[in-house]
């Protein structure tokens, strides 16, 4: 079945930027605001100096800043930001998830919007330049790619990219786990549930910045999230009232 494109209005696209001890450049935030209707930065319990810098950036650019009192993990920060964004009125038609460390460039947003006219989940694909990725991250990504293909029966590309666009059913996808495994669990649920998932090329940008990703511990959690069955919300079904039988009254 051919899916007819539904153009996305950039003014109805909100961005969510989780941050733990990362301060986005003001120029990056301002450029991003030229592509989206609003931005929510989630400070995931950063150290005081970084928290102060994030407040400064938010004040200078007029974006919304939400702060966790202590570090909860990227998955928790994404849930906080997505929840806050979806409470906007009017409700956004789509959300863009983007990291604060400068790896994700605002100039890629139009490609995400174009792909989002037919797909429900759009993910940045760094596989065109794997050599620029640290070997630990490259290995973890390639292993998780194979595991996800085996467990879902669908071909996938970059499974670890944090730059994503969500629309339609993808806006309600769960983020199981508080760490980096949340994004992997989100992708697996989308694939299992038959959502239209696609990838768009983005640059592979790694500098000398410190990363909160712990290769052994976080890779193990990601792998576990890909192997375990898809989690469903524990919601009790609402049953219709049982018709009264003639012998119910004793």
Regions found by a protein language model. Name each.
Residues 19-35, 49:
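Short, well-formed alpha-helical segments that are part of the catalytic scaffolds
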Residues 69-84, 106-180, 207-217:
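Acceptor/aglycone-binding surface of glycosyltransferases and processive sugar-polymer synthases
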Residues 43-52, 102:
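A conserved acidic beta->alpha catalytic loop
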Residues 89-103:
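Short beta-strand-to-loop acidic/aromatic patch adjacent to the donor-nucleotide binding site
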Residues 58-60, 84-93:
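Alpha-helix termini
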Residues 21-25, 46, 74, 105:
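Donor nucleotide-sugar binding loop of glycosyltransferases
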Residues 1-18, 22-24, 175-250:
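Hydrophobic helical membrane-anchoring modules
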């Amino acid at each position: 079945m051919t899916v007819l494109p539904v153009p996305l209005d950039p003014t109805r696209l909100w961005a969510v930027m989780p941050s733990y001890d990362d301060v986005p450049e003001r120029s990056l935030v301002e450029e991003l605001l030229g592509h989206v209707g609003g931005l929510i930065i989630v400070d995931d319990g950063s150290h005081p100096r970084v928290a102060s810098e994030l407040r400064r950036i938010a004040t200078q650019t007029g974006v919304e800043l939400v702060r966790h009192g202590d570090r909860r993990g990227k998955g928790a920060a994404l849930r906080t930001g997505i929840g806050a964004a979806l409470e906007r009125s009017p409700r956004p038609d789509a959300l863009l998830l983007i990291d604060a460390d400068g790896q994700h460039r605002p100039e890629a947003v139009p490609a995400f919007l174009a792909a989002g006219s037919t797909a429900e989940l759009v993910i940045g694909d760094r596989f065109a330049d794997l050599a620029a990725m640290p070997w630990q991250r490259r290995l973890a990504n390639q292993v998780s790619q194979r595991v996800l293909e085996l467990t879902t029966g669908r071909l996938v590309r970059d499974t670890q990219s944090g730059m994503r666009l969500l629309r339609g059913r993808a806006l309600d996808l769960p983020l199981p786990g508080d760490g980096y495994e949340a994004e992997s669990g989100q992708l697996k649920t989308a694939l299992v549930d038959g959502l239209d998932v696609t990838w768009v090329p983005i640059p592979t940008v790694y500098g000398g910045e410190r990363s909160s990703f712990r290769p052994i511990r976080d890779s193990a959690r990601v792998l576990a999230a890909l192997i375990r069955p898809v989690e469903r919300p524990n919601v009790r079904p609402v049953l219709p009232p049982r018709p009264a039988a003639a012998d119910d009254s004793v």
